[in-house]
C-alpha cells in the first residue's frame, strides 16, 4: 500500500469518527439546551408567581429603581430623588421601591440625607430593599478587567435584587446595563434606564488605540503595543456585549448630547432614546441675589475657587490642585500675594477608596506647599454648599468627557464664573454662548486652567457681573421643573402599561 493510499484510509477513518460523534453531540447539545430553557422558564414562572402574590397583597403595581449607591450624595442620586418625587406626585396608585447596597443606615436616614443634601422631600414613603452583595460592583474587587468584572458582578447583584422583590417596572438609574436583561427576560418586567455615562465609549477605545496614559489606561499598558492591542480587542468585545444588554431597555433616557451620541452608537435604539437633562437645584441658587463688588472691595477680597464633585479618580482633582499651584506662583509678585485666593474642594465619598483618595490629595497639597490655601469639605449639607458657591468667584471643573456636570450648572446658577473642562457635556450643552455672549471658560491642561483663572481674576467686577448674569439666565433649562416634565413624558409609555 502506497503512502498516499494509507493517508487516504486514515483520513476516511477520521471522517467516520467525527461523523459518528456528531449525532451524540447534537443530542447532547439539544438536551442541554432544553434543560437550560426549562430551567429559565421555571425561574421566570417562579418570579412571576412572586409578583402575582405581592400584587394580591398590595393591590398596586410597583416601580423599582436600581441604585446601589443611593446614599452617596452625588448628581446621580439627585436624579433618583427627583425622579421618585415626580412619579409619586403623578401616580398616586403606584408603589415605589429602591434597591440599595448601603449598609448600616436606615430608610429614614437615607431620606433625611436626600433632604439635607439636595433639599428634596418625597411626598410619600418608599420601600428600600437592602442588598448584601454590593461589593460585587466595587472596582477594587477587580484590579484587572474592571469593566467586565463589575458588569458580571452587577448581574449577580441584579439577581439578588430581583429575588428579593419582583417589580412590574424596573428602572436602572445608575448605569448597570447588564441588569436589564435579568429583569426583562427572567423577571418578565418592563425595563427602562437613565444613562449618566456609557460604561464604555469610543473615546475610551481611542485612548487605548493611541496609547495615551489615563486613569483607566495604566502606563504599563499604554507603553506596550501588545498589551494595548489586547486591550483594544477586550474593549471591542465588551462594547458589543454592552450594546446588546442596553438594547433590552424599553425606554432609554440620557443626560446630555455627548451621552446620546455614544449610546446611539452602542445600543442602536434611536426610537427609544431621548435626552432628559438632569435636575439641578438652580432655583435655590437663583433666589440669592448677586451684586457687583466695587474696586475697593475687590482689592481686599479673598477670591475662592470652588470645586463640587465626588472624590472619584475621573474627576481629576489633581489637575485642579496643580493648576492652582501655578496660579499661586504667579500671584506671589502681586501685593496681596497668595492670601488673595483659596481653593475649596467640596464633594462626597462613596467608600473607603474615595476617602483614601482624599488623603492622597491632602498629601499632594502638602508636597506642593499649598496646604494652607486649600480646604476640603466632605459630605456637607445643602445650605453650606449653597453658601460656599454664592461666596465663590470661580467654579472649577476638570473631568475629561464629563457626561453632564450638575456641579457646573449649580456653580453658574450661584453666580460663579465657571471654568470647566473643554470636553463632553460641559462643552456641548452647558458652557455654551447665550444671548450673544459667553457664559464661562473652558480649558484642558494645567497651563490653560492657570491662564483662565488669572484672566477671570483680572476681569473688572462689572465685566464679571455681566457674564455671571448671562450664565444664570442660561441654566433655567436645567431646572427641577424642566427635568420632571421631560422625565414624566419619557416614562409615560411605560407607566401607562401599569394601569392597563
Curated annotation (Swiss-Prot):
Topology, Cytoplasmic side: 42-231, 253-403, 425-500
One Pfam family of this chain: ALG11_N
Gene3D superfamilies from the UniProt entry: Glycogen Phosphorylase B (3.40.50.2000)
Gene Ontology biological process terms, A to Z: dolichol-linked oligosaccharide biosynthetic process; protein N-linked glycosylation
Domain of life of the source: Eukaryota
EC number: 2.4.1.131
Lumenal side: 1-20
Pathway(s) per entry: Protein modification; protein glycosylation
A GO CC annotation given for this chain: endoplasmic reticulum membrane
Transmembrane portions of the chain: 21-41
Cysteines joined through disulfide linkages: none
Reaction catalysis annotation: an alpha-D-Man-(1->3)-[alpha-D-Man-(1->6)]-beta-D-Man-(1->4)-beta-D-GlcNAc-(1->4)-alpha-D-GlcNAc-diphospho-di-trans,poly-cis-dolichol + 2 GDP-alpha-D-mannose = an alpha-D-Man-(1->2)-alpha-D-Man-(1->2)-alpha-D-Man-(1->3)-[alpha-D-Man-(1->6)]-beta-D-Man-(1->4)-beta-D-GlcNAc-(1->4)-alpha-D-GlcNAc-diphospho-di-trans,poly-cis-dolichol + 2 GDP + 2 H(+)
Coarse class of the protein's main subcellular location: endoplasmic reticulum
Membrane topology according to the record: Single-pass membrane protein
Entry coiled-coil feature ranges: none
GO molecular function terms attached to this record: GDP-Man:Man3GlcNAc2-PP-Dol alpha-1,2-mannosyltransferase activity
CDD domains: GT4_ALG11-like (cd03806)
Intramembrane stretch boundaries: 232-252, 404-424
Compartments (UniProt record): Endoplasmic reticulum membrane
Keywords, comma-separated and alphabetical: Endoplasmic reticulum, Glycosyltransferase, Membrane, Transferase, Transmembrane, Transmembrane helix
InterPro entries: ALG11, ALG11_N, Glyco_trans_1
Top-level EC class: transferase
Function: GDP-Man:Man(3)GlcNAc(2)-PP-Dol alpha-1,2-mannosyltransferase that operates in the biosynthetic pathway of dolichol-linked oligosaccharides, the glycan precursors employed in protein asparagine (N)-glycosylation. The assembly of dolichol-linked oligosaccharides begins on the cytosolic side of the endoplasmic reticulum membrane and finishes in its lumen. The sequential addition of sugars to dolichol pyrophosphate produces dolichol-linked oligosaccharides containing fourteen sugars, including two GlcNAcs, nine mannoses and three glucoses.
Family from the record: Belongs to the glycosyltransferase group 1 family. Glycosyltransferase 4 subfamily.
Protein name as annotated: GDP-Man:Man(3)GlcNAc(2)-PP-Dol alpha-1,2-mannosyltransferase
Organism: Danio rerio (Zebrafish)
Amino acid at each position: 500500500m502506497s503512502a498516499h493510499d494509507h493517508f487516504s484510509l486514515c483520513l476516511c477513518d477520521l471522517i467516520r469518527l467525527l461523523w459518528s460523534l456528531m449525532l451524540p453531540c447534537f443530542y447532547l447539545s439539544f438536551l442541554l439546551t432544553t434543560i437550560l430553557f426549562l430551567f429559565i422558564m421555571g425561574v421566570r414562572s417562579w418570579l412571576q408567581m412572586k409578583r402575582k402574590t405581592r400584587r394580591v397583597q398590595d393591590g398596586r403595581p410597583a416601580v423599582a429603581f436600581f441604585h446601589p449607591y443611593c446614599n452617596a450624595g452625588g448628581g446621580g442620586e439627585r436624579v433618583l430623588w427627583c425622579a421618585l418625587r415626580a412619579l409619586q406626585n403623578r401616580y398616586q396608585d403606584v408603589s415605589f421601591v429602591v434597591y440599595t447596597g448601603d449598609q448600616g443606615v436606615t430608610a429614614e436616614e437615607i431620606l433625611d440625607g436626600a433632604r439635607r443634601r439636595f433639599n428634596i422631600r418625597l411626598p410619600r414613603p418608599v420601600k428600600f430593599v437592602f442588598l448584601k452583595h454590593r461589593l460585587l460592583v466595587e472596582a477594587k474587587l477587580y484590579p484587572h478587567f474592571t469593566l467586565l468584572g463589575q458588569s458580571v458582578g452587577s448581574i449577580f447583584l441584579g439577581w439578588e435584587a430581583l429575588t428579593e422583590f419582583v417589580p412590574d417596572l424596573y428602572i436602572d438609574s445608575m448605569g448597570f446595563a447588564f441588569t436589564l436583561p435579568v429583569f426583562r427576560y427572567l423577571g418578565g418586567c418592563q425595563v427602562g434606564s437613565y444613562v449618566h455615562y456609557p460604561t464604555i465609549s469610543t473615546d475610551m477605545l481611542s485612548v487605548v488605540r493611541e496609547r495615551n496614559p489615563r486613569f483607566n489606561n495604566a502606563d504599563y499598558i499604554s507603553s506596550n503595543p501588545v498589551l494595548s492591542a489586547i486591550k483594544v480587542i477586550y474593549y471591542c468585545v465588551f462594547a458589543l456585549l454592552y450594546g446588546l444588554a442596553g438594547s433590552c431597555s424599553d425606554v432609554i433616557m440620557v443626560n446630555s448630547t455627548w451621552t446620546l451620541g455614544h449610546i446611539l452608537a452602542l445600543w442602536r435604539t434611536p426610537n427609544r432614546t431621548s435626552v432628559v437633562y438632569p435636575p439641578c437645584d438652580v432655583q435655590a441658587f437663583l433666589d440669592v441675589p448677586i451684586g457687583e463688588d466695587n474696586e475697593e472691595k475687590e482689592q481686599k477680597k479673598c477670591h475662592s475657587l470652588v470645586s463640587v464633585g465626588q472624590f472619584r479618580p475621573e474627576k481629576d482633582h489633581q489637575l485642579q490642585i496643580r493648576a492652582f499651584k501655578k496660579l499661586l506662583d504667579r500671584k506671589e509678585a502681586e501685593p496681596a500675594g497668595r492670601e488673595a485666593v483659596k481653593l475649596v474642594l467640596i464633594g462626597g465619598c462613596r467608600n473607603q477608596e474615595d476617602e483614601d483618595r482624599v488623603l492622597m490629595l491632602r498629601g499632594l497639597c502638602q508636597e506642593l506647599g499649598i496646604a494652607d490655601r486649600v480646604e476640603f469639605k466632605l459630605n456637607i449639607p445643602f445650605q453650606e454648599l449653597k453658601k460656599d458657591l454664592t461666596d465663590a468667584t470661580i467654579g472649577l471643573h476638570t473631568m475629561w468627557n464629563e457626561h453632564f456636570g450638575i456641579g457646573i450648572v449649580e456653580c453658574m446658577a450661584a453666580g460663579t464664573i465657571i471654568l470647566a473642562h473643554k470636553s463632553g457635556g460641559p462643552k456641548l450643552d452647558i458652557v455654551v454662548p447665550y444671548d450673544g455672549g459667553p457664559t464661562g471658560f473652558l480649558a484642558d491642561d494645567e497651563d490653560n486652567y492657570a491662564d483662565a483663572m488669572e484672566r477671570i481674576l483680572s476681569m473688572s467686577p462689572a465685566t464679571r457681573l455681566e457674564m455671571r448674569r448671562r450664565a444664570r439666565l442660561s441654566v433655567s433649562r436645567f431646572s427641577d421643573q424642566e427635568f420632571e416634565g421631560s422625565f414624566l413624558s419619557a416614562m409615560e409609555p411605560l407607566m401607562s402599561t401599569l394601569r392597563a
